[in-house]
Amino acid sequence: VAKAARRSRKRFGGSLQKYFLLDVSWTEEPGRIPILTSASILASFWDIVADWERVRYADYLMELVSSLFPQPGAKTKAFAFLLAGLRSLSLGEPPVSVGRKTEAALLALGGWGPDLSACRKCGRPESRSFRFVVAEGRLSCEACAGRGGILLSLGAVRTWRALQASSPPTVGRIRIPESVLMELQSVIPKYLMWNFGVSFKSLGDIPAGEKP
């Protein structure tokens, strides 16, 4: 945001590093590059750099938000979900868990969240298992499901529902059992990719079956 900041790192200290929440001020004139005049640290997520997977997922979350919400202007709630994800990574939550939580929350926030309320055929809200049809973003219950779709337990569906209904203050408090996390890992990234058809550079060297 400011050419002066790059020439004056001593002036702004370590506040220009990644993984800090800043309070910044700048001056702006028509047709000219904005000039950063002050930057102070409000919160640090620097513990992220202690682990490479945390770094990759932190960069992925920032890339994800900018990709899903590219329009100019404030994106207050999307930014709050991003901060919640960075905070969880900094506190040591497994990166894969943070990734799935943030993906589900942001998809719902942007209006792309799937309809997980009930079976698409019979309307049954509960079943021992469901199949999720990625192309439709809907569920089929155990009785109605054919061979298509991705098999999900009721626990996985309930967890995904909770993530879609979460707020920035509550999403980090949702605990995902390992077995459920594996199920969500098999479906949420696929649904995200189906909706947007983009690859994310931050996780570019992960095997194709595991992205993002």
Q: Where is each model-derived feature located?
A:
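Non-catalytic alpha-helical scaffolds and adjoining flexible linkers that form interface surfaces
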Residues: 1-212
